[in-house]
Amino acid sequence: MAYCNSKTDLSRVPLLALNMGFRKKVGLYLNPRNAVAADWMALAEALGFTFLEIKNYESAINPTVKVLEDWQARSTDATVGKLLSILSEVERNDVLEDLQPMIDEDVRRYCERLNRDPEPPVQVNQVDSCFHRTLERVGLTLHDDPEGTPELFDAFICYCQRDFEFVQEMIRQLEETDFKLKLCVFDRDVLPGSCVWTITSELIEKRCKRMVVVISDEYLDSEACDFQTKFALSLSPGARNKRLIPVKYKSMSKPFPSILRFLTLCDYTRPCTQAWFWKRLAKALSLP
């Protein structure tokens, strides 16, 4: 989409164009249980969520926001146009009428960003072979050649500092064995001095084939991990290319992140499957 105007096809505008302000506002309309008008449960059902999934959303602080977030992550057709169509189907035209100015403004801003940066994220199941060599993206990692091909990796490891001991074990098991995989570990491989968000998005999108997410209670409190996970999911909606692999290595007291529930988990906490854990993970990371 080169530009946007009043005739913009909203079925081609991804849901991520709608900012948090709009999503919270929709929640004010849909979160209250309503015996007459359709609420967030009706929206979730229309979006394709199962009964058990909808029951789990009842514990969310803002279930409407959570439903939209998960729909965006799991569906290939999560667009502004689709959302508006479903709100119309469940007869919540009041929401459409009241929030139309916010929708128009969010779409306008999204299109302006596209005009400034005409290269949207490449949603493919392999590392992008076309590198935009700006100064900000040269010499990011320890073994980068500023004059040659950037350093590439089999997987980006998403983790918080409290889980670094397990990341070190992952390095030993996957890099220093016959698997000979190449992992991108931020604290080890990334050079200091550049914008964290720019480096992270560059590495996940263009340098790494996949991303391993180390899930723990501490992970749930990490803003960096939250950004990395959602960015990786946006590159692979619906997990159609197995780009993101969640790993659980210790028991958790908090609920497993709902945004990752639809992905197959590599679970190190189950004694009966630990013998196969590293082989399964290595195989998943070795796929084309």
Curated annotation (Swiss-Prot):
Main subcellular location: cytoplasm
Keywords: Cytoplasm, Immunity, Inflammatory response, Innate immunity
Death domain sequence ranges: 25-103
Record SUPFAM superfamilies: DEATH domain, Toll/Interleukin receptor TIR domain
Cellular component aspect of the GO annotation: cytoplasm; plasma membrane
InterPro entries per the UniProt record, alphabetical: DEATH-like_dom_sf (IPR011029), Death_dom (IPR000488), MyD88_Death (IPR034249), Myelin_different_resp_MyD88 (IPR017281), TIR_dom (IPR000157), Toll_tir_struct_dom_sf (IPR035897)
GO molecular function annotations of the record: TIR domain binding; Toll-like receptor binding
GO BP annotations listed: defense response to Gram-positive bacterium; inflammatory response; innate immune response; MyD88-dependent toll-like receptor signaling pathway; positive regulation of canonical NF-kappaB signal transduction; Toll signaling pathway; toll-like receptor 4 signaling pathway
Places the protein is found: Cytoplasm
Gene3D superfamilies: Death Domain, Fas, Toll/interleukin-1 receptor homology (TIR) domain
Pfam families (alphabetical): Death (PF00531), TIR_2 (PF13676)
Region (Intermediate domain): 104-148
Domain TIR as annotated: residue spans: 151-285
Domain text: The intermediate domain (ID) is required for the phosphorylation and activation of IRAK.
Record PANTHER family: MYD88 (PTHR15079), MYELOID DIFFERENTIATION PRIMARY RESPONSE PROTEIN MYD88 (PTHR15079:SF3)
Function noted in UniProt: Adapter protein involved in the Toll-like receptor and IL-1 receptor signaling pathway in the innate immune response.
Protein name: Myeloid differentiation primary response protein MyD88
Organism from which the protein derives: Takifugu rubripes
Taxonomic lineage of the native organism: Eukaryota, Metazoa, Chordata, Craniata, Vertebrata
